[in-house]
């Protein structure tokens, strides 16, 4: 039986079908193997074989991925790789193209870390909404760490320099090894249950993933999330992340930074206190000045509205009117005297005795006439002044008081009491009578 033409494939077509089948059947997969025949040409790509005791397969990692490797791949090294299975069409060889490679020992831990992190994250253990805020002023701190490590020295040094008044309790523990995670968890739970601390700090220095593994324990992560006391995690270096970092309420990149985040610098605090004190003194002085100015203005308004002030104003007006009248009288007298002197000079220039006598008679008449007119003017002005005085006396509150009446005002604000419903039993009043003021109380 002869095949049909459309059933016959070329090698390239067959390789293409095989490649599509491989890539569709194998998504990104993980493989742990030993490296063999490692080659790195000038292009920067990596070519090698992945093998175990019974088989091997070709693999490649292109330069864009290979440049981020944290180690130098060598033949015989055991690695954990991730990539996809494909087929190199030109030679019909199937191979893996990798996007990730790490040493196998740490790689296994890394995979376990990622799986546990994903599971706890799905439960909401790392949600930002459940994290507790840090207290504004930490007074007592529990530090859970190794008593001999560099981390505790860094923390205590920074705390002593920045805020020596802080009370610090060191809770010593192992920070790596099989029993470290359980011991750290027990100390954390005990410190939280005591209720004595404002913050609990978990910390240790840097190390490999295996060295830091105690802080990736599931029970410890759950204890951190359940703690009622805020927890700060400062494990390893800035590039190291542990599950305790994600579960804690605050993650610090290093132990020293954690100490700086927890307490203020005493020098900055003292400077801020001095500035605040100066602002408070200035504000108090300004407030007092404003209050005194308001009191002065109120006193001026009160004085301006009192009966005594009105009476004083009328008296000043009366005195001013008298001075003006007296000045006008003097001016008129001066003008008339000047005319008389002028007339006398003219008379002295004429020799006939008869004219002189006549002029003297006229002069005598003229002298009497202004005096009479002036006397009448003065009498009329005096009468007008007496009338004004009687009018002022009639409207003066003090005149009313002198006739036996009294003026009632409130003691607290000086308000004039005009009606009964303005006062209540127990109110303090002042009664102004003719010769003084009497304090009274409403019953």
Swiss-Prot record:
CC per GO annotation: cytoplasm; exodeoxyribonuclease VII complex
UniProt keywords, alphabetically: Cytoplasm, Exonuclease, Hydrolase, Nuclease
Annotated signal peptide: none
First-tier enzyme category under EC: hydrolase
Example of a GO biological process term: DNA catabolic process
InterPro entries in UniProt: Exonuc_VII_L (IPR003753), Exonuc_VII_lsu_C (IPR020579), OB-fold_nuc-bd_dom (IPR025824)
Protein location: Cytoplasm
Catalytic activity: Exonucleolytic cleavage in either 5'- to 3'- or 3'- to 5'-direction to yield nucleoside 5'-phosphates
Keyword Nucleotide-binding part of the UniProt annotation: no
Pfam families: Exonuc_VII_L, tRNA_anti_2
EC assignment: 3.1.11.6
GO molecular function, one term: exodeoxyribonuclease VII activity
Keyword check for ATP-binding: no
Complexes and interactors: Heterooligomer composed of large and small subunits.
HAMAP family per record: Exonuc_7_L (MF_00378)
NCBIfam families: xseA
Protein family according to the UniProt entry: Belongs to the XseA family.
Function of the protein: Bidirectionally degrades single-stranded DNA into large acid-insoluble oligonucleotides, which are then degraded further into small acid-soluble oligonucleotides.
Name of the protein in question: Exodeoxyribonuclease 7 large subunit
Species the sequence originates in: Stenotrophomonas maltophilia (strain R551-3)
